Amino acid sequence: MTLEVTFLGTSGAVPTTERNPSSVFVRRNGDAFLFDAGEATQRQMMRYKTGFGVSDVFITHGHGDHVFGLPGLVHTWDFNDRTDPLTIHVPRGLRGDIEDLVFSAGGDVGYPVRITEATPGAVVRSHDDYEVRAFETAHSTASVGYALVEDDRTGRFDRARAEELGVPVGPKFSTLHDGQPVELDDGTVVSPEQVVGDPRPGRTLVYTGDTRPHDPVVSAAEDADLLIHDATFANDASERAAETGHSTAGEAADVATEAGAKALALTHVSSRYAGDASEISAGASGFDGEAFVAHDGLTHEIPFPDAD
């Protein structure tokens, strides 16, 4: 079951020749989303061949480097005769602004577009086996982050134990693994608890958008399999980070450490580090898990916690 992210834009507020403004494409099996949609996001989707089958766009805040790609995307989908509905999730109070941005240049489109406000702590998208939750972040304007959280999975089936109990190889194995008891020919009933292990955790993907280190971010990122965190500045620019509502790489690493995240992606890299993000990378060296500076076009697959 695939869960992967493709970084479409990893720059700070000002793009560079190597980095587009913020956007992350997320694919989970047949579902596809965008986290933020900076300028030229649609071109990045074409460039990195993600496909355009996006059902939801999750906007963290209203700054241009996170939303200026929306009008082009929405109207290109219309030019391509899209009929599937689109939901754009935005922080509270931003619905009218985003509606004006999306439709002021090109007018209405021929498919349903729903703009809904995301309240921190709320589930903003539900699916059979995962959900997307909004959480509070700390930026210079109204902002939220988003966590994609999978449900626990069924425990492992102990075939050897099932055979010891006399369960014949065949359909009864599947019945037990699906959580239903089976009756053997001699009348013995075997329950799932006898042959199926404890539930196994699903995966958690967390995207902060722009933020200072913040306790609600730590809570949302608890045991996350991948935390994508603002790392606009190197550690020697901590005052500038605080002034602008951003984080240093070291602060991102501290959040990841406190949360117990397994992997950390550093993004929203300031243009002052154009061509050389080594200071950003070095700044996160205090994190014991996997840490990397995201770059445009990078695809990262998120494994299950028990994949080994």
UniProtKB/Swiss-Prot annotation:
SMART domains noted in UniProt: Lactamase_B
Signal peptide stretch: none
UniProt catalytic activity: Endonucleolytic cleavage of RNA, removing extra 3' nucleotides from tRNA precursor, generating 3' termini of tRNAs. A 3'-hydroxy group is left at the tRNA terminus and a 5'-phosphoryl group is left at the trailer molecule
Stored InterPro entries: Metallo-B-lactamas, RibonucZ/Hydroxyglut_hydro, RNase_Z/BN
NCBIfam families xref list: PRK00055.1-3, RNase_Z
Database matches in PANTHER family: ZINC PHOSPHODIESTERASE ELAC PROTEIN 1
Protein name: Ribonuclease Z
Origin species: Halobacterium salinarum (strain ATCC 700922 / JCM 11081 / NRC-1) (Halobacterium halobium)
Gene for this chain: rnz
